[in-house]
Amino acid sequence: MSDALEARVMELEIRLAHQEDLLQSLNQTMIEQQQRIDSLQLQMEGLRQRLAAVIENPLMDPNQEPPPPHY
């Protein structure tokens, strides 16, 4: 193999190695972001359920609440 061809193959191998590393890094970042999205969706669903419960049973008017035990 000529020196020019060998240098070109070497350069392509280096580029490929860098691209593979970048792809792996991006994939890991995407996995972490999806995990965060899943967690946030679960939290949001919990908040929706709590809000629905509050809407169904609103808090009593402070005048309707029984007095504290020390009265």
From Swiss-Prot:
InterPro entries associated with the record: SlyX
Coiled-coil regions listed in the entry: none
Stored Pfam families: SlyX (PF04102)
Signal peptide (residue range): none
Protein family membership: Belongs to the SlyX family.
Protein name: Protein SlyX homolog
Gene giving rise to this polypeptide: slyX
